[in-house]
Amino acid sequence: MQEQYRPEEIESKVQLHWDEKRTFEVTEDESKEKYYCLSMLPYPSGRLHMGHVRNYTIGDVVARYQHMLGKNVLQPIGWDAFGLPAEGAAVKNNTAPAPWTYDNIAYMKNQLKTLGFGYDWSREIATCTPEYYRWEQKFFTELYKKGLVYKKTSAVNWCPNDQTVLANEQVIDGCCWRCDTKVERKEIPQWFIKITAYADELLRDLDKLDHWPDTVKTMQRNWIGRSEGVEITFDVKGYDNTLTVYTTRPDTFMGATYLAVAAGHPLAQKAAANNAELAAFIDECRNTKVAEAEMATMEKKGVDTGYKAIHPLTGEEIPVWAANFVLMEYGTGAVMAVPGHDQRDYEFASKYGLTIKPVILAADGSEPDLSEQALTEKGVLFNSGEFDGLAFEAAFNAIADKLAEKGVGERKVNYRLRDWGVSRQRYWGAPIPMVTLEDGTVLPTPEDQLPVILPEDVVMDGITSPIKADPEWAKTTVNGMPALRETDTFDTFMESSWYYARYTCPQYQEGMLDSKAANYWLPVDIYIGGIEHAIMHLLYFRFFHKLMRDAGMVTSDEPAKQLLCQGMVLADAFYYVGENGERNWVSPVDAIVERDEKGRIVKAKDAAGHELVYTGMSKMSKSKNNGIDPQVMVERYGADTVRLFMMFASPADMTLEWQESGVEGANRFIKRVWKLVYEHTAKGPVAALNVDALSEDQKALRRDVHKTIAKVTDDIGRRQTFNTAIAAIMELMNKLAKAPQEGEQDRALLQEALQAVVRMLNPFTPHVCFTLWQELGGEGDIDNAPWPVADEQAMVENTTLVVVQVNGKVRGKITVAVDATEEQVRERAGQEHLVAKYLDGVTVRKVIYVPGKLLNLVVG
C-alpha cells in the first residue's frame, strides 16, 4: 500500500472499475427489498455548480448506504434538456439548441462521473429526444380524448416589435429584454390540462405524505387554495347581462358598497366605448405584466364605468368600477368590495372616495374604528337588517340561504389553483401533438404519425421559433385531408413531471411505461431537490402520477414517499466600485483577505489592488460571481474530500457555507484514516479477535466502536443527520489513533474497528474506502460489503461513572464496576487524589450513596 494518499490516482482507477463491472446497474428482483433513490434531474446548462454537487452527493450517500443494507437500489440520472436558456445560448454562440445541449450533456456527464456518483447509466434519459417525448405526446392525445385537455384564449406577454410571446422572466421593467419595446398583454389560444379536476385529491393526499417537509405541504395547500363560499348574481342597470361574484365572507355582504371588474371584462369594454378615461385605463392594464406575484404589490388603480349594480338584498344601487387588481383569468373577472372589512377594498375606497360601511362589530362589541384601516377579523353583525346579532357561522348560513331562496346565490367550493397552461410559443420544446383541419376542426395527431419530431437542424434568429417561421413544417394530412400542425411546444414542466417513472423502463417500446417494472420500483423512496420547486414541479409531478394511475400504468397514489429539500450553498461575496459607480463582483477565489482573531473577514483586496467590500455569505450565483467551480476543487483535493465536506459542513436541509478551510479539514481527516490503515497494515497479518480475552481498556475501546456503529446507523438511516454521523466517526478515529498497539489483540481490535470505519465512511468517500477495504483484506468489493452491525453485547456498560461530593460539593468523578458495592465505591473514592485532599484529617460523619450515580460524604 502507498504511504501517501493520492486521490488523483485512486479515484480514476476506482471509477473505471465501477464502469467495467457495471456496479450500479440494477434490474427488478422480487426476492429483494427495493429502494428507489432519486435526485431531481439537472438542466444541462454546461457545467455543474455546487448546488448540483450537494444535491447529488446527498442522494449518492443515501443510495450507497441502502445498497449496503442489502437492498436492490435504483439511482438513475438524466437530463431535463428542453428550455429557454438553450435558445439564448444558441443565438449567442451561432449554433442550434440541439448541438449546444448535447455537448453540455457530454461534458456534465463526465463531471458527474469524476465525482463518483453511483448511477445506473444504462437508464440515462435526455428529455429532448423523440424516444422520450413521443410517449408524452401520445399521453397528451389520450388525455384530450378523455376530456382532460382543452384550448382557450389566455393572456400572455406580447412584444409587438418582435411579434413574439415573452416568458415572464424576459420582461424587464415592462419592456422586452431584446428590443426594449413596451410589452403588451395579449389574449392568444393555448392548450390547458385540467389539473383542477384533481384539486380535491391533490389537497387530500397531502395528508398521506408523512415524510414530506411541512413547509412544502403548506405551500401546496395554499397554492391549491380550497375555499367555501357563495356565488352571488347582481343585476346591472342598463347592461344586458348580470355580474357574478364569489365571496368567502357572505357575512359581510350587507357592507358591499361597490363592485370591481377586470379591465378585460365585457362590461368594462362596453363602457369604454364612450369613456376616454376608461379606454386609456384599459390600455394601460393591457401593458402590465402577467406575473401574479407582482399583482400583490403594485399600486391599485381604477376608473368608474358609470354602471350601477343593484344589491340583491337591500335594493341599493352600488357603482361598478374597472380595477387593475381584478384578473379575467381568475373566477368571473368581477369581485364584490366590502371596504369596511377587507384591506385592499378599504385602500381602493379611501383613494377614490367610495362609501365605507361597517357591518361587523369589534371584538369588544363596539362599532369598529375604520379611520385607519379595515376590520378584517370575524365577529357579530350589526347594520345588517334582519341579520343583526348573528356571529360568523350563523350569518354565513343565513345570508347564503336567503340569497339561494331569492335565486341570486349558491354555495360553491372554489380553488385558487388554475388549469395548467402547457402551450409555449418557443422552439426548443416537444411539439404539441394537435392538428387543425381546413374547416377549423381540431384533432389530436393520429398515433401512426407520432412522434411529431422537432427538427434539430435549424437556424435561430433570436426572435421567431424556426417551426413557426417555416410554413412547410406545419403542413400535414390527416385521414387524407390537409391539416396544419400546432407550432407551439410543451411547457418543459411536462417532461419533468413523469421522467422518474420512465427511469424504471427507459428502453420499453410498447408504451409510456412497463407497468410491471414501474410498480416494482415506484413510488420513489426518497426524492431530493430544492425547495424552490415546492409548488410548480412538485405539484405537476404529483398530478401526473395520478393521471398515469388513472390510465392504469401505476398502482400507487403518490410518486414519492419522502422528499428531502437540501439547503442552498453560500459563499463569500466581494465587490469593488468601478469608475461609473457600478459594482464589480470579484470571485472569492481571487480575494486576498485579512481576518481577525475570531476568523472574521475584516479587510479584502484583489490581485489588482482594488479595496473590496465584503457583503457576507450569499447564495452562490453568477450575478455575484461567487460560485466555486466543483471541478477546480476536485482537481485540488479529490472528489472524496469535496463530498465529505458537503455532507459534514451542515445538516442536509440547512444552508451550507462554503469555506475552503473546512475543505482542507475534510482532506486532513481522510489523510488521517489513510495513515492509520497504512501503519496498521504495514505490521503484517492480524490474529483473530478473541472478545473474551480483552482487557477492560480494550473492552471500553470496542464498546466505543460498536456505539459509534449504532449511532452512525441511526444518524444516516433514520434521522438523516449525515453531519453528526461523520462527527461520530471522526471522534472514534481520534480514539483509535491513540489506542495502544502492543499485543496481538490490540491489533485484532483495530482491524475490526478500521473495517467498520471504512464501511461507515464508504457512502461519503467511496473511492478511498474502496481502496482501503482491499488493503484491510475485506471480502470482495466494498460496494457489495454489508453495512457493519453493532454488537449489543459489546455495548453493554460494565462500568459506570459516579459523581463524588464532599459536603454536597462535587469534588471528583470515579469509574467503578456496574455491580460495585458501597464499600468498594467508598474505597475507590478515597484513592481519587482530587477527593482525597478533602478527606485528609477529617471524620466522615455520614455517607449518602445513590447506586451507580452519586456518593456524598458528609465530613466534620
UniProtKB/Swiss-Prot annotation:
Gene3D superfamilies: 2.20.28.290, 3.10.20.590, HUPs, Isoleucyl-tRNA Synthetase, Domain 1. One of its GO terms (cellular component) is cytosol. InterPro entries: aa-tRNA-synth_I_CS (IPR001412), aa-tRNA-synth_Ia (IPR002300), Leu-tRNA-ligase (IPR002302), Leu_tRNA-synth_edit (IPR025709), M/V/L/I-tRNA-synth_anticd-bd (IPR013155), Methionyl/Leucyl_tRNA_Synth (IPR015413), Rossmann-like_a/b/a_fold (IPR014729), tRNAsynth_Ia_anticodon-bd (IPR009080). A motif ('HIGH' region) lies at residues 42-52. It is found in: Cytoplasm. The keyword Ligase applies. A motif ('KMSKS' region) lies at residues 619-623. It comes from the Bacteria. ATP binds at residue 622. It catalyses: tRNA(Leu) + L-leucine + ATP = L-leucyl-tRNA(Leu) + AMP + diphosphate. Keywords: Aminoacyl-tRNA synthetase, ATP-binding, Cytoplasm, Ligase, Nucleotide-binding, Protein biosynthesis. Its EC number is 6.1.1.4. One of its GO terms (biological process) is leucyl-tRNA aminoacylation. It is an enzyme of class 6 (ligase). The keyword Repressor does not apply. GO terms for molecular function: aminoacyl-tRNA deacylase activity; ATP binding; leucine-tRNA ligase activity. PROSITE patterns: AA_TRNA_LIGASE_I. Belongs to the class-I aminoacyl-tRNA synthetase family. This is Leucine--tRNA ligase. It comes from Salmonella typhi. The lineage of its organism: Bacteria, Pseudomonadati, Pseudomonadota, Gammaproteobacteria, Enterobacterales. The gene is leuS.
